[in-house]
Regions:
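Short pre-catalytic strand/loop immediately N-terminal to key active-site residues, enriched for Gly-Thr
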Residues: 143, 169-182
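Short, small-residue alpha-helix embedded
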Residues: 118, 182-195
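Glycine-rich phosphate/adenosyl-contacting loop at the front of the ribokinase-like
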Residues: 1-35
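Glycine-centered short loops/turns at secondary-structure junctions
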Residues: 30, 76-78, 150
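Glycine-rich, highly charged phosphate/nucleotide-binding loops
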Residues: 33-41, 62-67
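An anion/phosphate-binding loop that grips the pyrophosphate of nucleotide cofactors and donors
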Residues: 49
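Conserved phosphate/ATP/ADP-binding segment of small-molecule kinases
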Residues: 92-168
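Glycine/small-residue-rich loop that forms an oxyanion/phosphate-binding "nest" at active or ligand-binding sites
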Residues: 55, 63-112
């Protein structure tokens, strides 16, 4: 109810596959989504929102520039932001982009177990966008990442694991159907930006 009363504007830089469903998830929560990614306006927009989300799912050079500008502007304006490093391990370009964005100090890092393990330097079984590793196997890496970057890390899956590097929480209620529907994780990232 409080979220609906506040109706925060959420700047969602997400991928083409996820835009529609993510916008609808944010709307259903009571927040207001804005799917803005162009470098020409990303920074200006990031300064006036309640939260920013950055998802590298369909990254391109122009989108990457917009992501960096938005993250820098969000930090300058004390706007919290969430990084979703979708399949950062798939290509060298994607990996470099995820590392550059991580260096810009997101408030929250949200990913599946394979993504978090990869960013934390752990070996992973992943090959595409879907997790091949268990949430439990990513917990130590998540705690190390959270401490090293002074952020919250959320490893999502059947049971989510959330940590700031010291405190931990498990969130139950995941569905086995979620991996069968595209953009569920991406939508969760945008929803997190509303809070």
């Amino acid at each position: 109810a409080d979220l609906r009363a506040k109706n925060p504007l959420v700047h969602c830089i997400t991928n083409y596959v996820a835009m529609n469903i993510s916008a609808n998830v944010v709307l259903a929560s009571g927040a207001s989504p804005a799917m803005i990614h162009t470098p020409e306006e990303a920074a200006d927009f990031a300064k006036i929102v309640g939260g920013l989300t950055v998802n590298i799912g369909t990254i391109s050079p122009a989108w990457f520039e917009g992501m960096k500008l938005a993250a820098i502007a969000a930090n300058e304006a004390a706007v919290p932001w969430v990084l979703d490093p979708v399949a950062h391990f798939a290509t060298p370009y994607r990996s470099r982009a995820a590392q550059e964005l991580l260096a810009l100090k997101p408030t929250i890092l949200r990913g599946n177990a394979s993504e978090i393990m990869g960013l934390g330097g752990q070996a992973s079984e992943a090959k595409g966008v879907d997790a091949k590793d268990s949430v439990e196997s990513a917990e130590i890496g998540a705690m190390k990442l959270a401490k090293a970057h002074n952020m919250v890390v959320a490893v999502t899956g059947k049971t989510d694991f959330v940590t700031d590097g010291i405190r931990t929480a498990r969130i139950f209620g995941g569905s086995p159907v979620m991996p069968l529907v595209t953009a569920m994780g991406c939508s969760l990232t945008c929803l997190m930006g509303a809070f």
